[in-house]
Amino acid sequence: SMYDHPFQWGSERTGPDLARVGGRYSDAWHVQHLKDPRSVVPESIMPTYAFLADTDLDLNDASAKLRALKDVGVPYSNKDIADAVLDMKAQADPNADARDLMKRYPKAQQRDFDGNPGRLTEMDALVAYLQVLGTMVDVNAAAAQEDLATERGR
């Protein structure tokens, strides 16, 4: 994503490029892949992340994390920061009133991501994240930036 901050430029990246994985696979596929990678990709060397389904999502510092991201240039509003926990709960609950969330994040998806509607888990959070990767890219804006760079001889 355009707001990712790699810990070290040029560091080795292991695994597939997930930049555009959003929407390519179902939530159930992602959950199965995270629980037992070789059951869906036999040659996978990825370790299992089944524990994510059993780990409740820690909501205690969500606002602080968004505030820190805002400090390094991610365009979160004060309302985004104040409502971080409410937004996370609403996004993972298909029965919640998510009108305010959808107004601020029009491309957000609202549903139970991990197949366990009774709990908000780290699996919900990771699958929701994977499902959004690459879906918010404005290809026209990116192309316009490339055209501008070419015009300026870069």
How would you name each of these model-derived features?
Residues 1-154:
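Periplasmic c-type cytochrome electron-transfer domains
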